[in-house]
């Protein structure tokens, strides 16, 4: 069974349709990713001056950091058409061919989750990216023949959260690789303040700070929290969102000061109380929480590891001193061998 949607999930949710209005429309409006923005601005200006298609661009980074938004901005700044799709949607080579043959000169084709393209589709994409040609096999058996179709010179913008899953031939064909990083609290404050202005709701500096601190370094989460806090402010007939309103709303939503939600705290508390802080294997945790293993590894643990609350050791999951302080619990004395580098992790 699919786990319920979490308020602090960086993945796109069905109720995120409202964040379209919050997205910046130009590079000058885009907050954060300063080096990436500066480089993109130069590459776009150079391509525009030469009247050429921009080199293919690859955005790499965790979900919710603005890869799709930046792809749209690239097309808008170039003044060209924009077509969007995703790796899992392009099931056959013919699906990709249909997309490519409908592109105009210098258009931008955006493929999200590009690491999920099938090998057969990738083979068709290589000559399209390199030579702007489609090399298709028509027919079967002895009657099969190769047909080359010239394409308009286009820009492929790929986005991936899993750069390690990209094949080397595909990765090497992107002339402009750009890595997006988590945002600072100050950058998220700017995003929240701008979002409040777009939504027509008042926002104090400390209110923006309170939302930004709990947004896990991710604009998508910041926008989602902002919309829910706005609901609390409207219900209270407040003129503006201040720290008190933001704290009340986010506490009601069970998002604490570190951005952890009820599931995060349940995970940490289970290890602390039931297993003495660890180490404990992931299969044991899956049984204890009644959650599938992949949900624990892909949804719950990454942020806890990033924040320094959790370690993955060869012997299992282990809480750090930081985690016990956050939970307000005394850290038990643990044998140094629990931090050992040898042996295999219990049912990991």
UniProtKB/Swiss-Prot annotation:
Gene Ontology biological process: DNA recombination; DNA repair
Subcellular localization(s) per the UniProt record: Cytoplasm
Region Large ATPase domain (RuvB-L): start-end pairs: 1-183
Region (Small ATPAse domain (RuvB-S)): 184-254
Catalyzed reaction equations: ATP + H2O = ADP + phosphate + H(+)
Pfam families: AAA_lid_4, RuvB_C, RuvB_N
Family: Belongs to the RuvB family.
UniProt-listed HAMAP family: DNA_HJ_migration_RuvB (MF_00016)
Main function: The RuvA-RuvB-RuvC complex processes Holliday junction (HJ) DNA during genetic recombination and DNA repair, while the RuvA-RuvB complex plays an important role in the rescue of blocked DNA replication forks via replication fork reversal (RFR). RuvA specifically binds to HJ cruciform DNA, conferring on it an open structure. The RuvB hexamer acts as an ATP-dependent pump, pulling dsDNA into and through the RuvAB complex. RuvB forms 2 homohexamers on either side of HJ DNA bound by 1 or 2 RuvA tetramers; 4 subunits per hexamer contact DNA at a time.
Name of the protein described by the UniProt record: Holliday junction branch migration complex subunit RuvB
Organism of origin: Bradyrhizobium sp. (strain BTAi1 / ATCC BAA-1182)
Gene that this sequence comes from: ruvB
